[in-house]
């Protein structure tokens, strides 16, 4: 489960022949394995990918997955591949998983809103529900966490905590419950960073609620809860359509 932000990633794909670096993010050359895998899967390895986003990389916002998804859609248009949405989402999902940079980001991003993953897999196998909301979102980023390092280690504790949280959220699918369970999941999976923990406590003391973005040194909240706790957060909304 998660939150699809209006602060997204814009991707442009140009067919081969450019002298520009093959992949750039906010004007800087960058290596994104998930993007390379999408290009190979769609037979567009000669393409130039240009991505822009206000979101930091490695801070729990699923930027690599969003870049992979945007690349899939942009390649489909630029190269006239004539693939269906499910095909494109599946290609980006596989690329993100195989790159070790995400497990469910792409499918959730394609769904939009506050998605709940009921069953794993691409759109032809997985099942997704959602929580109705049109809330303001605030976030504060303190640093980055390596998703690949976490997912490549022992994930037994993480998986068990996730299954408990998902079951509880399905019983009560609300935005408030999502925050509470996200916070509990981070603690049970031993993922909560000190700075996010401090931010969460400050928000609680101010009468609000907050949680940690997965996987990043980032605290997020709905409404004005981070602002009310004295932080100067970035502000966006929930994007209803991914």
Stretches with model-predicted labels:
Residues 2-3, 9-14, 105-109, 114-116, ...:
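Short beta-strand scaffold segments in enzyme catalytic cores
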Residues 43-55, 92-95, 195-206:
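Short, hydrophobic/aliphatic alpha-helical segments
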Residues 61-86:
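DPxDG-like acidic metal-binding loop motif
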Residues 85-131:
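Alpha/beta catalytic cores of group-transfer enzymes, especially the acyltransferase/condensing modules
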Residues 125-242:
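C-terminal nucleotide
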